[in-house]
Curated annotation (Swiss-Prot):
CC annotations in GO: plasma membrane
Name this protein carries in UniProt: UPF0391 membrane protein Bxeno_A2959
Organism: Paraburkholderia xenovorans (strain LB400)
Family of this protein: Belongs to the UPF0391 family.
Entry keywords, A to Z: Cell membrane, Membrane, Transmembrane, Transmembrane helix
Entry-linked NCBIfam families: PRK13682.1-4
Transmembrane annotation, as ranges: 4-24, 33-53
Length: 58
């Protein structure tokens, strides 16, 4: 689960860089939307990773 959280964090950063720097000016709105989606998914998978790990360890 933590691997997925890291994956979504990297994808969110890449989408943000492309969307906010003007590199892909035509797709900036799509990149901003994807940035928010991937940040939310990153947080969800990060929390799930910690919850599952805690249940496995206990």
């Amino acid at each position: 689960m933590l691997k997925w959280a890291l994956f979504f964090a990297v994808v969110a950063v890449i989408a943000g860089v492309l969307g906010f720097t003007g590199v892909a000016a035509g797709a900036a709105a799509i990149a901003k939307f994807l940035f928010i989606v991937f940040v939310i998914l990153c947080v969800v998978f990060l929390v799930l990773g910690f919850v599952v790990t805690k249940k496995i360890v206990d």
